[in-house]
């Protein structure tokens, strides 16, 4: 049976992590996001270099899970179609079925992303064909 990848996208505070964690627990699947690789103990630390390394670790973790034949979820901002395609195309090459969900709620973000940055992300956000919008 083909593994499945659920890509959950949205701006900070849209509910990506919350829904991803709930789905992962309910179905017993792995969940990855860049943020989990930016934790230093209990502290979230974001720097450009750390963010780049975290993105690579997240991508590699997702692909390794799919290669092992297991379903998984990845939740990140994925603002552009290109960002979604990186995961979707690589997953499809591994024979995985890919689904994309976009979160559009505004719960407030836990990482204190500045309002100007959030506004820029929202303006730059691109639709993705076939995505489920929640």
Predicted regions: what is each one?
Residues 1-3, 65-66:
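Phosphate-binding P-loop
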Residues 2-9, 14-17, 22, 26, ...:
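Conserved GTP-binding G-domain of TRAFAC-class P-loop NTPases and closely related GTPase folds
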Residues 8-11, 34, 74-77:
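Short His-Asn-centered micro-motif
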Residues 18-70, 104-111:
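Conserved substrate/cofactor phosphate-moiety recognition/catalytic segment
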Residues 41, 82-83, 129-132:
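Solvent-exposed, flexible loop/coil residues
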Residues 52-102:
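Glycine-rich phosphate-binding loop used to anchor ATP phosphates in small-molecule kinases
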């Amino acid at each position: 049976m083909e593994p499945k990848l659920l890509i959950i996208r949205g701006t900070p505070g849209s509910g990506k992590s919350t829904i991803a964690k709930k789905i992962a627990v309910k179905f017993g699947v792995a969940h990855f996001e860049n943020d989990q690789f930016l934790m230093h103990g209990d502290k979230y630390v974001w720097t450009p270099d750390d963010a780049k390394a975290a993105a690579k670790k997240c991508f590699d973790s997702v692909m390794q899970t799919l290669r092992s034949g297991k379903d998984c979820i990845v939740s990140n901002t994925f603002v552009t179609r290109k960002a979604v395609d990186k995961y979707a195309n690589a997953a499809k090459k591994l024979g995985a079925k890919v689904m994309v969900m976009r979160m559009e709620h505004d719960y407030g973000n836990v990482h204190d992303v500045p309002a100007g940055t959030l506004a820029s992300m929202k303006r730059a956000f691109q639709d993705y064909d076939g995505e489920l919008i929640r």
